[in-house]
Design a protein with these regions (language model features):
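Hydrophobic/aromatic-rich structural module bridging two neighboring secondary-structure elements via a short loop
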Residues: 1-30
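A short acidic, often aromatic-flanked loop/helix-cap motif at beta-alpha or helix-coil junctions
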Residues: 34
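Ferredoxin-type iron-sulfur electron-transfer modules in oxidoreductases and energy-metabolism complexes
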Residues: 27-30, 38-191
Length: 191
């Protein structure tokens, strides 16, 4: 169910599925307020997800959905809300307004749903504190007990964003010519 997520020797784990050794160090997951002992408050993460207004506006009745289409949204629906991904995320650690791995994975689930007429609104809602803020470090992917790959999901959302006219705001004003003709004395072609 995800309610028993903890950190064991600094790595996010589900307590119910982890065999402990005598010297293991157990602590609450990171980036959440501790309520008591190993129990943390996850209400802020729930609030972030609600900001995305993830719902299906299924007014597109003529669209056929294949088994492949169902498969494309199935994995993102398997999250057990353990918050291990938020605990391991270096961006969420410094920016609590960052939507985070789970919210973005869930956004992809709704964006990939062909019957959802609300897809463009969701893509718009993930541009600020969202897809472009992720460092793509894979920390979330490594700790997910369900085998979900938030990093790949975020990369897919970045591609979908570009296809819909958005761009990475952190590279928009970057001057790629500032390196000069020879990359500051280094020639990548070896000439």
């Amino acid at each position: 169910c995800g309610s028993c997520a903890v950190r064991v020797n600094g790595i996010e784990k589900l307590a119910c599925k982890t065999n402990l050794n005598e010297n293991d160090f157990i602590e609450p997951i990171n980036n959440s307020n501790i309520l008591k002992d190993l129990v943390v408050d996850v209400s802020h993460e729930t609030l972030l997800i609600s900001k995305l207004n993830l719902s299906i506006d299924a007014n597109i009745e003529s669209i056929q959905v294949s088994q492949e289409d169902v498969k494309n949204i199935d994995l993102q629906s398997n999250c057990i809300l353990c918050n291990s991904c938020y605990s391991s995320c270096p961006v969420y650690e410094v920016n609590k307004e960052f939507l985070g791995p789970f919210a973005l994975t869930r956004a992809l689930r709704y964006v990939n749903d062909k019957k959802n007429a609300n897809r463009l609104n969701i893509i718009d809602s993930i541009q600020t504190n969202g897809v472009w803020d992720c460092t793509l470090c894979s920390a979330c992917t490594l700790v997910c007990p369900q085998g979900i790959d938030p990093k790949a999901d975020i990369m897919q959302l970045q591609n979908i964003s570009v296809q819909n006219g958005y761009s990475n705001p952190y590279t928009q004003n970057f001057d790629f010519n500032s390196f000069g003709d020879d990359f500051g004395g280094f020639n990548p072609n070896g000439f």
